[in-house]
Amino acid sequence: MALDKPYLDVPGTIIFDAEQSRKGYWINQFCMSLMKAENREKFKANEPAYLDGWPMTEEQKLAVLARDLNWCMRTGGNIYFLAKIGATDGKSFQQMAGSMTGMTEDEYRNMMVSGGRSVEGNRYIGEDGTAQAQHQPQGSAGKASA
């Protein structure tokens, strides 16, 4: 019996639940490997070859190579693990988060310092707030997949 997941109706949000955890196990393990300097060096020297050493899906590998964190998350990546990719690339977490929203680092920081996104129009998918897919750089691709 499938679980009722009312949280899937939150726009602009991928909930890292047990299903996402299973789906993203190998992409997250790859990210954890970047904790070691020698693995970061191997990855940067030949990214496709390093990724081929992991039993990730081809979609996960493409998402990593594209540095598309929204795509990585849709394939099961957890943002706290994915942050290691950004760190390997010399990016701050603010830069990474900004890239996920289509904002510059400064725009993202200013939005967060000002209290974050308004909940108005962002409580459920289908409203017209700023977190809705039609207002995001990933567009309708940002919707949760079945």
Each PLM stretch: what is its role?
Residues M1-A146:
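Charged, low-complexity intrinsically disordered segments
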